[in-house]
Amino acid sequence: MKYSILAILAHLLTNIKATQEVFTLSDLPPDSCPIDSPISCSKNAQELENVNSCCYESPAGVILLTQFWDYNPATGPDNLFTQHGLWGNMCSYGYPQFCDPSLEINPNGEIIRSIIVDQFGDEELYNNMSYSWKDYHGKDSSFWAHEYNKHGTCFSTIKPSCYLSNTPKNQNLYDFFRIAIGLFNKLPTYDWLAEAGIVPTNSKTYSLSEIQSALNDKFGANVFIKCDYNHAINEIWYYHHVKGSLLQHNFLPIDSVAHTNCPSTGIKYPPKGKVAHPTLTTKTTTGTSTTIHNPTGIPARSYVHLSGKSGCLISNGKWYTSGTCATYHFKKTIDDSNIEIRSSKGICGINGNEEFTCSRAVSGGTDFQIKDGKIGYQDKFDWCFGSTTGSGSTAQTSVKLADGSCDSFQLLI
């Protein structure tokens, strides 16, 4: 009988930690996979049409390890870029997501601890996740479940069909989190920046070239640096190809294919728990420029939930209970009086039906306020449900300003 390389590796790893035992391809049956496992996205891999994709990552062979710098609200240790996720991107363009509903777990993620700790006895892994893989709303388990359901179900080399028949149930889920944390621990972004003299501060800014040089030199390839609306460091993405199965941990750094949105100079790196102060430059009577700091006092980004309701707002501004929450971005207006809200769809505002909506067609959406974690519009903080499109799990419902005739709720960040 032929076994995939993944099946044998999983069998060897079932009751040991990856750091406790080393094995090589020579331990595996010679006819399981190519002797020299292909590198994902390489010409060699693309020509192996008849080779089981349990042997190498396909078609999503670009592997990203992504990290957050969540400074407001402060999330995770003060000296750590926290884990965002382990993602697989297509070799050409785009990325798969939610690839196999049969493998998904409950979005609350409560089962994850019992699988990792109770079933596999790996309390060390669970503790590492609790320390470094943080959700800025404090819902770590839900965040882990989201990352597994969206990305972990898409890796070809840890599909359940790749494992031996006597492999324990949930081995693929356990392997996803173990591999993600293992790679994360090899990419200490905070330490690499600190070694180059780049540390969190509100008293100075850094250039893009300084940050790139510090990280690229350590990683061995160009990394992707993402900034938020305040020109503060927000995320770091590390791109890889992988040789053979994910279980071999043979990740090969490659240059980022994404382009930074950070400015060439003036990049902020605020300490956690502090606000990245936007700067306004004005001319003094002597002709020199003066920098004025205006604290925003609001989070740079957040999900938007409804008080007393499940679900959240998606990027078009509608309420949805079955999909992924949208990340909303918040910025004080120049006069510091109101808030501009954006999603990936564009600026958010109130339409003619007094419904909250976000799109590129919206303009001048700066009449929002945030008070005690609640979103208001022109000092109105109560909202109601509006019209619904679709049905069942795909239904999307608009939210509108309350008029006193409905059961109202609040929009919470």
UniProtKB/Swiss-Prot annotation:
Compartments reported by the entry: Vacuole lumen; Cytoplasm
Keyword Lyase: yes
Residues of the signal peptide: 1-18
UniProt xrefs under PROSITE patterns: RNASE_T2_2
E.C. code: 4.6.1.19
Glycosylated residues (UniProt): N128
Single GO molecular function: RNA binding
GO cellular component, as recorded: extracellular region; vacuolar lumen
SS bond partners: C33-C55, C41-C91, C54-C162, C99-C154, C227-C262
Catalytic activity, as annotated: a ribonucleotidyl-ribonucleotide-RNA + H2O = a 3'-end 3'-phospho-ribonucleotide-RNA + a 5'-end dephospho-ribonucleoside-RNA + H(+)
Catalytic residues in the record: H84, E147, H151
Keywords in alphabetical order: Cytoplasm, Disulfide bond, Endonuclease, Glycoprotein, Hydrolase, Lyase, Nuclease, Signal, Vacuole
One Pfam family of this chain: RNaseT2L_C
Protein's GO biological process: RNA catabolic process
Primary location group: other
Entry keyword Secreted: no
PANTHER family, alphabetized: RIBONUCLEASE T2
Described function: Rnase which modulates cell survival under stress conditions. Released from the vacuole to the cytoplasm during stress to promote tRNA and rRNA cleavage and to activate separately a downstream pathway that promotes cell death. Involved in cell size, vacuolar morphology and growth at high temperatures and high salt concentration.
Family: Belongs to the RNase T2 family.
Protein name: Ribonuclease T2-like 1-B
Originating species: Candida albicans (strain SC5314 / ATCC MYA-2876) (Yeast)
